[in-house]
Amino acid sequence: RAAAFAAYRDDSRARLRAELGRVRALTEAAAVATYWTAFTAAIEESIMTRGRLARKLLNAPAVPFINGWIAYHNRHDYRGPLEPKFGDAITFRPDPERARPFGTARADWRLLQRYAPTVVQERSAQPAYPGEYDRFGSVALHGEQPDTALPAVDTDVPTVYAYIDRKRIQGVEVRQLNYTIWYPRHPAMSLFDPEAGALDGWTVRISLDQADRPRLVESVSNCGCYYKIFPGAALEAESRAAYGDRLTDKTLYIEGHVSDGVDAVVPETIPGLETAPYGITLYMSAGHHQLVTIRAHASPGDIPGDSARAYLLAAYDELEQLPFHDRRASLFAPDGLVREAHRRECVLLSPSGLYHAGHPRQRETQMIYFDEANLDDPGLLERYLRLPPRAFGAGA
């Protein structure tokens, strides 16, 4: 595997150098324009915008109704804190002995291990669906051919997939730790549940300051729905000192207002986040598989039952190169959507122009608030929050 990776890397570098050489050799403006036209024409449009206008035109009569429903949904959704009132739950903690995955830098892996979350998963006493649907696990592909392979989740091997990305926020490079879980299925929670379907999951993202201390946590479904921000209590205190007053109709000082869209949901702060010696605790609901709340330290009263299991911390890269017979294949189709995980929600919301609404998808393809913003936009936090000066350390 290491040799194949090195060969691919070297070949890619050689191809890039050759292409850059051809670009540098262009001396005439017309030649540059021709090259640029061909270059941009070869770039496939992102799933974030692909076919949006066509879908709206094809479903024109329903567009006003769907857009009105979205506006109502955004305006009236509950935005406050929730309590993890679980009758029964199982706790999953990271396995400290997990070896560093190939291709992950040692320093990055140490950070991912250090802040790997504890997951408290609610269990229904008498679910109307198989109980394993409420357990996250390891993802695999099954079938005969790569293009028809079907994904499955092995709940006997609880696994959290993690990676680090970096963004410039307020003029400084901010490390963001991403942790993703996958369930076998989103069960039907009613007679008609448009969110039901194969594979379900959740992602949390922890933004660190220059001293590698957590400052805030973002939470989102793997399809891009239900995006929320949980700032650390210390960060909220800094916003209070910087701004003095809350904005109208806001509970927290750090909450911002978006003039051209929907304001972010910021339910509550996380006391002790910046000083927590290890990972946060996530409280995940049964059935819907939504994050209920986050704690810096798990309170014994918040965790019913006494069962606990270790989970494997794995590199997110594994999802993009899963073992499949004598080769490797991705969990995701070329458009970034999880294989065979269609939702009825996609059909219902197609008049809005959304591309496969509710369909779980790959990192860097998630849109939030009904495609209003890109989850991986470096300016996302500055768009939605009134960050205090130097929120992540020295900078602008």
Question: What is each residue range found by the language model?
Answer:
Residues R1-A99, A198-D200, A211-A396:
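Domain-length functional cores that host ligand/cofactor binding and catalytic or interaction surfaces
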Residues Y78-D156, D165-R166:
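Charged, compositionally biased non-catalytic regions
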Residues R135-V217:
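Short N-terminal edge-element motif at the start of the domain
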